[in-house]
Amino acid sequence: MLILVSVVLKNKLGFIFTAFSLFALGFYMASSSNLKINIKNPVFLECKVISFPEKYYKNFLSDCKVLNSNNKNLINKEVKLISNKKLFFLSNVYILGKASIKHNKIFVKVVNLKEEKNKFLSPILSFRDYLIKNFKENSLNYISFSIGNALIFGDRSYIPQNIKKAFINTGLIHLLAISGLHIGLLIFILLFIFSFWDKRKSYLITILFLIFYPVITAFHIPVFRASLMGILYLYGKFKYLAINPMNILFFVAFISALIYPEVIFSVGFQLSFIAVFGLILSRKYIEIDIKNKFLKFFITSMLLSFFAVLWTTPLIIFYFHQFSPTSIFATTFEMFLLIPYLFLSVLNMFSLFLIKPLINIMDFIGLKFIELAKLFDSLKIMASNLDLNLIEVLTYYILLGFITINSKIKIIYKYILFFILFSFLFVMSKI
């Protein structure tokens, strides 16, 4: 229905309806899909590893696309391999194991396996392992290594559960996942580091870094997506082209879905996409003209957090049934630690994590980053047992989009309407 409406409407409003139509499909599929497969053990699998290994209790967990199996129901399915061995990304593996279904996902406990490593990627991934090894050896302690492993290499599996819980309770868990925010900060940092050269050279070096960075961060789809957006944006700058961020966003979403069609059903993809989509639509409310750079940074960060929360909260309630208003102001304060941390992480990457004092300064900031999250968690500001249905979510987004793009409404009245709409969201979620 929404798709038909979007054809009739024109310009931005039709554009918004098209986006929400796609999300409606993703919401429906993500919330209603129920895996039903008859599995007989043991299973024999030939599959391709499509993720980097993550720590899973005393073993490692890897995603794998099944190419062939004695159980025909598993062919072309994605399974999670539990193994005591780290499997290389894009390796072909032959497995004997025991399969089970948990949380609507297929898990295979590996009994025996043979691995054929990808000849092209193997040396690159070995270099990634070399950097992680150097970082671990020179890090202050396990906690500082675990936070760095998440913020630099994209692996949150080493972070202790109590620390993860503090970030979840405060709505700051997105800061532990490398996403558009981190890539944006890295672009800013790299352009600053190479600002002594002319702009075109600094753009080119940053593009080369963004091409390589997804390998360092385990080819996580959010990193690939954000890096591709950054590359296209910088390439436009390099070639003096007119840049439309919305076009770049939808092009990258299309490429992501083309490479990995299931991504449209991913909650992470939906949250990331709607956040960037909302920030692009709301950017005229975020860009403020203040001469004091510190004050401008602080207010801009608060506005970014506010609009990101405004656009993502319905999805968070829809999927997780909880919300922490702490994230609106907590994100801003954490940014004051995240920026120097990422700045030092770039220097450490260039020095191959061999300069211990430089790593330890970064570790110190990382530990303060955790302490601040725990401080906000101690405030215990959390709304739980919330519930929204798909119609309510879509109605909210249509109204929010209409208020945002309507040029006839004065800005002060828009903020009042934003507040009323946001408050109404919680009234609906409690009914």
Task: Describe each region flagged by the PLM.
Residues M1-I37, I95, K105-V111, P123, ...:
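N-terminal leader/targeting segments
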Residues N70-F89:
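Beta-strand/loop nucleic-acid-binding surfaces
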Residues K40-Y56, S62, G97:
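Structural detector for short beta-strands of small beta-barrel domains
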Residues T18-S21, I205-F212, L249-A253, K414-F424:
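Central hydrophobic cores of alpha-helical transmembrane segments
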Residues I106-M229, L234-Y235, M382:
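Aromatic-rich juxtamembrane segments at the membrane interface
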Residues F219-F418, V427-K430:
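Internal transmembrane alpha-helical bundles of multi-pass membrane proteins
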Residues F60-S69:
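A short beta-strand signature
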